Curated annotation (Swiss-Prot):
<dbReference type="GO" id="GO:0006744">
    <property type="term" value="P:ubiquinone biosynthetic process"/>
</dbReference>
<keyword id="KW-0808">Transferase</keyword>
<feature type="binding site">
    <location>
        <position position="108"/>
    </location>
    <ligand>
        <name>isopentenyl diphosphate</name>
    </ligand>
</feature>
<feature type="binding site">
    <location>
        <position position="215"/>
    </location>
    <ligand>
        <name>Mg(2+) 2</name>
    </ligand>
</feature>
<dbReference type="InterPro" id="IPR008949">
    <property type="entry name" value="Isoprenoid_synthase_dom_sf"/>
</dbReference>
<keyword id="KW-0414">Isoprene biosynthesis</keyword>
<keyword id="KW-0809">Transit peptide</keyword>
<feature type="binding site">
    <location>
        <position position="341"/>
    </location>
    <ligand>
        <name>an all-trans-polyprenyl diphosphate</name>
    </ligand>
</feature>
<dbReference type="Pfam" id="PF00348">
    <property type="entry name" value="polyprenyl_synt"/>
</dbReference>
<keyword id="KW-0460">Magnesium</keyword>
<dbReference type="GO" id="GO:0004659">
    <property type="term" value="F:prenyltransferase activity"/>
</dbReference>
<dbReference type="InterPro" id="IPR033749">
    <property type="entry name" value="Polyprenyl_synt_CS"/>
</dbReference>
<dbReference type="GO" id="GO:0008299">
    <property type="term" value="P:isoprenoid biosynthetic process"/>
</dbReference>
<comment type="similarity">
    <text>Belongs to the FPP/GGPP synthase family.</text>
</comment>
<dbReference type="GO" id="GO:0000010">
    <property type="term" value="F:heptaprenyl diphosphate synthase activity"/>
</dbReference>
<feature type="binding site">
    <location>
        <position position="211"/>
    </location>
    <ligand>
        <name>Mg(2+) 2</name>
    </ligand>
</feature>
<dbReference type="GO" id="GO:0032476">
    <property type="term" value="C:polyprenyl diphosphate synthase complex"/>
</dbReference>
Amino acid sequence: MLRVGRIGTKTLASSSLRFVAGARPKSTLTEAVLETTGLLKTTPQNPEWSGAVKQASRLVETDTPIRDPFSIVSQEMSTLANNIGSLIGSGHPTLNKVATYYFQSEGKHVRPLIVLLLSRALSAIPESERDRGTFDASDVTENVGELNPEPSINDPLSPIEILHGINPDIVLNPLSRPSDPLPYESNGILPKQRRLAEIVEMIHTASLLHDDVIDNSATRRGSPTGNVAFGNKMAILAGDFLLGRASVAIARLRNAEVIELLSTTIANLVEGEFMQLKNTIVDNSEIANKATFEYYIHKTYLKTASLMSKSCRAAAVLSGARNPIVDASYKFGKNLGLCFQVVDDMLDYSEGESHLGKPAGADLKLGLATAPVLFAWEKYPELGDMIKRKFDGPGDVERARFLVQQADGLSRTRELAQKYCDEAVANLDLLPYSESREALRNLTMKMMNRSK
């Protein structure tokens, strides 16, 4: 229940308020706040706009707190690791151990959480408005007994004996083992959307195994990395194996557009890593600074935002939603992914190793120029030479960190992250109101305040 009074015990975060004040079409909350206070006619061009927004933030109160995003899809998240385990099992015990190593730690699992929440939010769209393409029989919830079901996401496309390989009588992996059938629909989330969330986490984990080898990382989430625990060769092979298993699961979704989207994300991850290994700076000019920053944003999209954006679009495609919703879902994932990584780059300068669960200041030590140092470069041209030599000179890392702190590098990085955060929140406008949509907004805004 919404109450509007002179003093509210709870106020909206600034980013939430910016969304409320600029919502199009205006939400019930917007109308209640602005109309009640007589500020409905106020516009951003009006000198009183800033004061109006601040006043609105003090007047909004809701009796119904926003639920923790995880709790809304807790059932699906609680079975995530087990379901993935059934997809990636191998006949080789060592490969099993390495491939499942990162799934055993307490990770954030942000990507599958986003896919599941978005899928549930998409289920609030009336079925009459979800007519982009056709549903597979395995995703239809009514009159199941009267259908001639098409193959499910657990059924192979090729003959079992082909997938088995040389010995068709031996069961080595889940490609040929029958899986327990998934419920037709649970919590508003379709079986293919749940499988999508699992695939996304598999792709992400494979990229972590590979990244830790490339970066020679020693710890992740407070534990030894895969390359430290098992060696570089095993870690690389385990990452490859995960991508192979993910590719099989992608194919079994039997949706050409989704297959294209997810296959592209794998290529994007590799492209982004290549971009990170390369340096584009050629001189210390303003043009070089701008080009380097654009390069950084593009690399960030490929390495982080591509998987989020394309998996969000895939969830919308599987829901049957129309093109405007599908496009908005993609933009939401893109902006959220960029916000997530920009905040991550900022934390590398502001948090310690014990808090992050991984070495602090790692980017500079790896020779990487991220947003904080690129912004500081505009004020301190000497950073250009350090970027060019990848901070490999004596004292470069310490000097660069000092200059970032002296300049406005961190504050401008926060502003950039906030921009992406606000855009991601606005991208959710097209979705109908639901608990899951509000949880996505809450999750997005919390990205700005995370400390690890």
